[in-house]
């Protein structure tokens, strides 16, 4: 087998085979990476929504609960805002990226997120919501008002500009 044409043909076949194998391998790896990324993002979004769905019940009438919440919001104007419609905003970029409302509850007044804006591919405002719940709990307890965890609710996603998540169902 002293013919160099055979060696050249084998080398060309290996190069062409490697090109086709490389494309298929790249495509397969890309699909696997995309699936993993979507799964990871979905898990993070579900975790964030579960925590944003957590409510607290302030064992006081709405005016007393509003007084506690107003005081907390006014102390942190860069994080929280009073909205014209009586709700409260949690700021990520805009003053109302998440909207918090006080709702009558059988045990007093429930504080809950009713809408949150999606930025950077997922709902934001989780840290500020945690802080708001903590500060309201401390403020209420300082006035001898008890606070308890309230019912969870769920959200539905609305596409648009911007994308937002809105409360759909309150569970007891």
Give the positions of each predicted feature:
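A sequence-composition feature that detects small, non-aromatic residues
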Residues: 9, 13, 18, 50-54, ...
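Proline-rich intrinsically disordered, low-complexity coils
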Residues: 4, 61-63, 77, 123, ...
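Cytosol-/stroma-facing membrane-proximal "stalk/adaptor" domains immediately downstream
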Residues: 85-172
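N-terminal topogenic membrane-targeting module
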Residues: 24-93
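N-terminal signal-anchor transmembrane alpha helix of single-pass membrane proteins
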Residues: 1-38
């Amino acid at each position: 087998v002293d013919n160099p044409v055979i060696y050249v043909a084998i080398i060309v076949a290996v190069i062409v085979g490697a090109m086709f194998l490389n494309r298929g391998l790249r495509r397969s790896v890309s699909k696997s990476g995309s699936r993993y990324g979507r799964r990871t993002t979905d898990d993070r979004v579900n975790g964030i929504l579960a925590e944003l769905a957590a409510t607290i019940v302030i064992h006081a009438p709405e005016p007393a609960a509003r007084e506690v919440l107003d005081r907390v919001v006014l102390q942190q104007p860069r994080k929280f805002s009073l909205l014209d419609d009586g709700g409260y905003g949690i700021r990520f970029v805009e003053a109302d990226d998440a909207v918090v409302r006080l709702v009558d509850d059988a045990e007093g007044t429930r504080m809950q997120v009713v809408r949150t804006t999606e930025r950077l591919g997922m709902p934001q405002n989780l840290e500020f919501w945690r802080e708001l719940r903590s500060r309201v709990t401390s403020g209420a307890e300082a006035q001898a008002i008890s606070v308890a965890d309230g019912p969870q609710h769920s959200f539905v996603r609305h596409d648009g500009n911007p994308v937002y998540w809105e409360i759909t169902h309150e569970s007891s």
